Amino acid sequence: MSAKQKPVNTPLHLLQQLSGSLLEHLEEACSQALADAEKLLAKLEKQRGKAQEKLHNGRLKLQDAAKAGKAKAQTKAQKAIGELEELLDSLKERQTQTRSYIQQLKRDAQDSLKLAQGVGKVREAAAKALDQRAAKTSKPAAAK
């Protein structure tokens, strides 16, 4: 046999490892979901800004066409303005939904992490039990 024996993984070891990795993965998943939602919100805000700029330019074109008396250009500009206004309404609604989702996600993450504190206590209890066992096995060895 080799001088260094590989420690045997017991159910206590497994419980400690699993509870630790569960907490780690939960925290990571909560953070990632929040980051993804905030990226989406930023993307929507950027799209909305571009659409507002296009709408402003479209209204300027409409004014120019009206001043020049170009009916065809006016119709085209009005159609483009209508489409841009619909797009802006849609983006505004999606932003509102995303903000709501982010709020709910934050609450869910908080609740999940609060509930997971019990798992942390399980990990600590398993570690304590392993430490106590190690202390018991080292005392007889020291007495010899």
How would you name each of these model-derived features?
Residues N9-D36:
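Short, charge-rich amphipathic alpha-helices with coiled-coil/heptad character
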Residues D131-K144:
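Long low-complexity, Ser/Thr/Pro- and charged-rich intrinsically disordered regions
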Residues K50-T75:
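Extended alpha-helical coiled-coil "stalk/arm" regions
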Residues Q97-A134:
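Short, Lys/Arg-rich amphipathic alpha-helical interaction segments
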Residues A42, G49, H56, G82-E85, ...:
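Generic structural signal for well-ordered, non-transmembrane alpha-helical segments
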Residues I81-Q103:
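Amphipathic alpha-helical coiled-coil segments
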Residues A29-G49:
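Short, charge/polar-rich alpha-helical segments
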